[in-house]
Amino acid sequence: ITRLWDPAEPVVQTDSELVRQRGEINEMRMLLVRKLRATFPEQFIGGIQDSPYAQTQCPDLILSEHSTWKRIYLHRMKHSKICIASTGLHQSSGWKIAEYLAAGRAIVSEPLCYEVPGPFQAGENYLTYTSADGCIEQIRTLLAHPEQILQMGQRNRAYYDEWLRPDQIVTKALEQAKILL
């Protein structure tokens, strides 16, 4: 499940870079969903969240309201072997990556633009893509090697337990604060 960003929002209109960035994100997301549906029609579960803007751009890709309920999304994500992440606004990594880690899923993602704590590495915790075709190739690689899906999922759950679980975040912040005091 992904969303489109409306480049006509008034707050965006004052910043041509934001308009450009939103357009690129939207184009990549629509292309990705189209190609994933075409390439993996029996396996891919995903689409675009409904919005007035999405209705004008890709009505064929919009998911039903029921499909976007958090409970349904989490159930589907927890029962998927491979989860896909795309870059968000300001080159951010979506919170979905943390959800995928907590669930111990294999991840295929656009390259991360920001540093994350601990040993979280491309090739080990996630495979990267820079195009829709690249995403499909990474998924095919994982599907051809089920042991890699399992191993990546195990590494990701271990990473979550060590670095992202709320108690670990607090503990590490307190440890860091002692160093700085």
Regions of interest found by a model, annotated:
Residues P59-S64, I72-L181:
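Catalytic binding pocket for nucleotide-activated donors in carbohydrate/polymer assembly enzymes
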Residues I1-Q91, S109-G118:
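Nucleotide-sugar donor-binding catalytic core of glycosyltransferases
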